[in-house]
């Protein structure tokens, strides 16, 4: 399967920045033989405009409310995203879990609302430093994954991407080894095989995220269980985004 590179812009970039990004992207990508899929998680205020500016790049949201509509001030529903031509969203990022009281239950509700409507759910899971040091990484990640996928059918699993982001590695420069990540994802796949068919689990796209850059990406991409990367600050620069797309296609 092709590698998938997702740039998560978080709360960065203005409209002019997005235009500049596309100009730089076009300049760099023309020198690359592209053999990877790629998308950008854009701040919600710019989704509509970014879709037009970033032609050729899939644009996704960074969060989506699970209700179709309602009195939820400040939120954007999956149906509003779909109405704007956005067919996917990051869900359950650790920053949402830590700062905005996202729970396993709301992650599950959001995941279901997206996949039921044929939209892509990029579900983030990952352990804290304390959990990592206590050798609880697998238990935490499996528990989050299992809860996120509760009531997701095998047919709907094709619209799910799991992004494993150890919280202790996000923006810190600390990274686990490729083998550590590969072994953990293999264990998660083994458990998922008890709930879904082997073929469905093998087809599930699983990304690594957490201080990914052009120096360490190859180590992750060569692992059999890692199908790409969810990348934050490094991919704010178009040149870097293209570097990872190129590495993902090798």
Curated annotation (Swiss-Prot):
> Which residues are substrate-binding?
8-10, 171, 211
Give a yes or no for keyword Cytoplasm in this entry. Answer: yes
SUPFAM superfamilies given in the database record: Triosephosphate isomerase (TIM)
InterPro entries (alphabetical): Aldolase_TIM (IPR013785), TIM_sf (IPR035990), TrioseP_Isoase_bac/euk (IPR022896), Triosephosphate_isomerase (IPR000652), Triosephosphate_isomerase_AS (IPR020861)
Kindly indicate whether the keyword Isomerase belongs to this entry: yes
State the Gene Ontology BP annotations. Answer: gluconeogenesis; glyceraldehyde-3-phosphate biosynthetic process; glycerol catabolic process; glycolytic process
A Pfam family annotated for this chain is TIM
- Molecular function (GO) terms listed? triose-phosphate isomerase activity
Keywords noted in UniProt = Cytoplasm, Gluconeogenesis, Glycolysis, Isomerase
Pathway the protein contributes to: Carbohydrate biosynthesis; gluconeogenesis; Carbohydrate degradation; glycolysis; D-glyceraldehyde 3-phosphate from glycerone phosphate: step 1/1
This enzyme catalyses: D-glyceraldehyde 3-phosphate = dihydroxyacetone phosphate
Cellular localisation? Cytoplasm
* UniProt family annotation: Belongs to the triosephosphate isomerase family.
PANTHER family in the cross-refs = TRIOSEPHOSPHATE ISOMERASE
> Subunit details for this protein?
Homodimer.
- What is the name of this protein? Triosephosphate isomerase
Native source organism of the sequence: Malacoplasma penetrans (strain HF-2)
Q: Which gene encodes it?
A: tpiA
